[in-house]
Structures are given as C-alpha cells and as structure tokens.
A protein has these predicted regions:
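Active-site-proximal cap/loop segments of hydrolase catalytic domains
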Residues: 4-123
C-alpha cells in the first residue's frame, strides 16, 4: 500500500508529487473527487472488524509516502482490530522510498519481511 491516508496527503500541496498525482488519485478540493477518494482511502476505511496480522514498513526520508502516515495508520488499525492479531510498524531511519540502499541493507529488510511472514504462518 502506498498512501495510507489519501485524503490528508493529497490535500497538502507542499508534499512532493501531490499535484502531479491528482489525475491518478484525485483532487480532494473537488467535492465529487473527495467523496470518491474517501471510498478507497485505507485510513478512512478502518472499522471495527477482524484484521490479519500486519507489518507496515516505512522510511523516515521517504519523500513520496510521509513517515507519519503509517505512524498514524498503525495505532488506528490496532484500536479497531477485533482479531487480536499483531500489527507491527517498522521505521527505517536512513532509507528513502525504496528503503535502504546497498545490497546488505536491502537483504536485511527482506529478511524482516520473511521473518514476519514465517512467524505468522507458524502460529
């Protein structure tokens, strides 16, 4: 998932690429588009229900998906999940949109993903 809080992000023209992505995501300043965007915005569609185990990853220096979006998304998901499954947040403190650069750093991120998946499957 890329933008977790579509409405807030696309309302902030100071965020890089926002205005260039109106054609793809919609422009919340347009009333009809706002209500359409609300139907697919992950953050705005969290409700009380069972959710699977979730690992959300982000990078502090991601210019395309601001780090505070997943930091806001995860606690709301935890609050509304009725399943008891874990919801984790991993913040990369040095990487950008593509994560850490370098072969070993990238492998560490992949290892985190596989570790999470294998741990959940073994429960």
């Amino acid at each position: 998932m890329c933008i977790r809080d579509s409405l807030t992000t696309m309302s902030d023209e100071s965020i890089p690429l926002t205005t260039f992505e109106y054609d793809e995501w919609g422009n919340p300043a347009n009333k009809d588009e706002y209500f359409y965007m609300k139907t697919y915005s992950p953050y705005d569609n969290i409700k009380n229900q069972n959710y699977p185990a979730v690992l959300v990853t982000t990078s502090l220096y991601d210019s395309q998906v601001q780090y505070y979006e997943p930091a806001k998304y995860v606690p709301k998901l935890r609050e509304h999940s009725t399943s008891g499954n874990p919801v984790f947040l991993s913040i990369n403190l040095v990487g950008g949109h593509g994560g850490k650069s370098g072969r070993l750093e990238s492998l560490n991120e992949t290892a985190l993903d596989y570790s999470f998946l294998l741990n959940i499957l073994n429960q």
